[in-house]
Each structure stands twice: as C-alpha cells, then as structure tokens.
Amino acid sequence: MRVLFATAEAWPLAKTGGLGDVAFGLTRALAELDCDVRLLMPAYPGTVEQLEGEVRRHTAELAGEGVTLIEGRLPGTGVGVWLLDDPPLFARVGGPYATAGGDAWPDNHWRFLRLSQVAAALAAGDLLDWRAEVLHGNDWQTALAPVFLRDRADRPATVFGIHNLAYRGLFPAELYPRLGLPAELWQPEGLEFYGQLAFIKGSLVFADTLVTVSPTYAREIQTPAFGWGLDGLLHHRRDRLFGIVNGIDTATWDPGSDRHLVAQYTGPDDRARAANRRAVARAVGLSEGEGPILGFVGRLVEQKGVDLILAALPRLLAAGAQLALLGAGDHRLETALRAAAEQHPGQVGVVIGYDEALAHQIEAGSDLFLMPSRFEPCGLNQLYSLRYGTPPVVYPTGGLADTVVDVDAHPQSGNGFHLAASDGAALAAAVERALAHWQDRPTWHAIQARGMAGTYSWAASAQAYQDLYRQVVASRG
C-alpha cells in the first residue's frame, strides 16, 4: 500500500502539538507493517538539516510554477520524507503557523493552499515517479487537497484525519476569489462557512473517508456541543466517519527503562513509587510526607479543566492530598496556580513551563493523574499514566472515555476514575473515591496492574489505519 501522509508538522522536524507526535508515531508504525508510506510537510528553518539518509532535491512544475521537494528520511524511522521547499512561504523565523509573538501568519491561506496543492499533485503522480494509492491529509492545513482531486478519475483514495475540530482554517470571504478555487464551491455545500472560507470543509465534504482520533470523539463531533458548527455535515457523513485511538511511543514512555526516573519498575511497586514521589516532591517544592500526590501535566487552559482543579483544591487538600502541576498557558490560570502554591506551601507545587524529564517524573511519582478536560479528542497523558501505573481521573469525553474505565462502575476491568460532571465538585468527589481505593493497597495494586497491562503502542493503531486504507481503496473499485 502506497500512502502519502500530508501534514504541517512531524516530530522531530517540527512540532507544536499532538499532530507532530501522530505524524511521527503513525508513519513509523505503518512503515514497520511494510506500508510504503511517505510524508510530505513544509521545509521550515532547520528541518532539512535533520533529515537522515541520502538527501536529494527534486524540481517539477505545478500550475505554471516551480515546485522544489527535498527528499530524505524521517529521523529514527524508515519513513521517506519530502519537504516542500518554498522559502517565501515557509523559511521564516517563528512557528509553523504563527510569528514568534504568537500572531497567526497573515498569509496562512496562501501557505497551506500551496501545501494542499502539492499534496494533491504528488499523490496523483504529477510531480515525481511515484503515486499514492491513498492520500492521508491531516487537519485544516492540508484539507484542500481533495478539492484539487475531486474531478479526476485516476485520483488516489483520500482519507482525512481530524485531530481537533476546533481548528477549522477560517479566513475572510474576500480572500476566496484570489485563491483560484472553483467559484461553484462558494456555497454552504462547498467551502463557505457562515460567510467565511473554511479550509477544513475541503476534506469534510470531498474526502472519501474521515477519521478522527477516538471513537467517542467521532460521535461527539456530530453534536452541537462538540461540532463547532460542522456537526450537521459530519452527521450527514457519519457512514464515512471513523475513530481510531492514537498510540504512544512505548520505547520513550516505559517505566521499566525510563532514564528520567530515579527508580524504574515494571509493575506495581510501592518502593519505586515512593522513591519517584520523593523526586517529584523535591522538584516542585512539596513537603515529603506519606499523603498521595495528584499530578497534572499539560497546557494551562480551560479546555484542560485547570479551573476545575482550582475549584476542587480545598477539598483535595482537606483529603490529605498534595498537588504537583507542570504546564504553561493562560496567564490568568498561571497566576492563580502560583497564588495557590504560595498560599499552600509544601502542599501545592507548580512549575510554569515544560520540562520533559519532570513530565516523566510526575507520571511515575504521582499516585493519581488529574485530567479533567472539558473535551479531549484523544489525549496522550492518560495513556502515559496508565502505562506508568498512575490511575487517571478524567471527565469521560473523547479519547478519555475510550481508554479510561471507571473502577467503581467496572470493578473487574477499571483502570481509573470518571468525573460525574464537568465541575470542581465532581472532580473532588472522583478523587475522594479514588483515595478510598488507594488506602486498600491490594485493590490499588490490581487497578495499577490493569492499567499497566494495556496495549498503548502505535502498532495496533497502525494496523487499524492500514485496514481503513484497504477499505477505502476497495470501495472506489
């Protein structure tokens, strides 16, 4: 199976969020299944230098303009990479989507229109001596690719990955006539979205198959609460909408060999947990006691339920718990967390920013992991927590609902704890339930063991994607 995986980012070349991790983990796992997967992304500053293998430059022509592709290998994998080398669009100081100051690049419509054009042409065999059977686009930055292929009988099958529907690629209507897109598609059944241009509709309407990052999220985005105004369209396409849970890098996230831990372990181990708890306490400024540590690692934004942690804080501390939090984000929430740490020295430890080693230590040294996200398409931290024997406390949405089983609802298979509602009181109640089990060590060890025994690698996810590719190719005859 020949697959072109088109993305705006891929770790370690460039990464701003979960899409970068997926692009690396999924393509590597597909290659290990003997899938001929190639990755296309822009050549941002510093990306070419990271390519492995023989690096070659290809030139071609598309719509009267030159196209330059730099070929190499994705570091640490057998995945071929083509970098779209277009310096006026992509060789600039800042991030893939925004300036160093955080403002969206004013020409993002041109930048990712071009990426979509090149993805379509490359997949169709118009640029190089290679053509894809499947074009797998990801998020709004590559979503226009199926538009450029829609009238071609010889086109590849098209699959579109929705990683977070909140990002729809919205642009002012007055840009539409300048982009060379078909005039007849400026309508609600095409690319128009309440008076704006929505790049993401290029794939939501025209891709053969849609896939998102968990079965529950695939259902949720068909509802007004999670659909961002696109729920009607997604419900209309529900027979071609699937959900596959992301995997994690189980070599990097392995408590048995994790170099960031002071004590490694392969199963429930109170002595190793105690050593790792002491390391976390020292790192974030907690007093070293016997009480449970509640961990949090993530963006400090309301989507992640950080305000719920603050609301639940009095009850959590009254239950004898300590909190270890690592993250950055909303200035208001950062300020509130710093104030909580000052008000409760030794009980609340906060590190603003991101530290990879500390993230691993919090997963291994906490007794519970808090993840009360209001919505979470898939989520990774709950998978890290399960693998590290740190039962997660989650609001059951998206991938959290698909991967975390409530202990009290399912005593024989439970591996974590669900909030009954998305509020601070429900979070406190869920933690109190969890701590009642934590006091019973044999029961707690069984909960930990079930989480650690789960399958979280990319191998199973990649097999599901390969099966989906075969289905969509077969459905096109």
Swiss-Prot record:
Alphabetical list of InterPro entries matching this protein: Glyco_trans_1, GS/SS, Starch_synth_cat_dom
Domain of life per record: Bacteria
Pathway as given in its UniProt record: Glycan biosynthesis; glycogen biosynthesis
Binding, ADP-alpha-D-glucose: 15
Keywords: Glycogen biosynthesis, Glycosyltransferase, Transferase
Catalytically driven reaction(s): [(1->4)-alpha-D-glucosyl](n) + ADP-alpha-D-glucose = [(1->4)-alpha-D-glucosyl](n+1) + ADP + H(+)
GO biological process terms held by the UniProt record: glycogen biosynthetic process
EC numbers on record: 2.4.1.21
This protein's record includes keyword Transferase: yes
GO cellular component, as recorded: cytosol
Keyword DNA damage: no
Transmembrane portions of the chain: none
Entry-linked SUPFAM superfamilies: UDP-Glycosyltransferase/glycogen phosphorylase (SSF53756)
Sample GO molecular function, one term: alpha-1,4-glucan glucosyltransferase (UDP-glucose donor) activity
Family: Belongs to the glycosyltransferase 1 family. Bacterial/plant glycogen synthase subfamily.
HAMAP family: Glycogen_synth
Name of the protein this chain belongs to: Glycogen synthase
Lineage of the organism: Bacteria, Pseudomonadati, Pseudomonadota, Gammaproteobacteria, Chromatiales
Gene: glgA
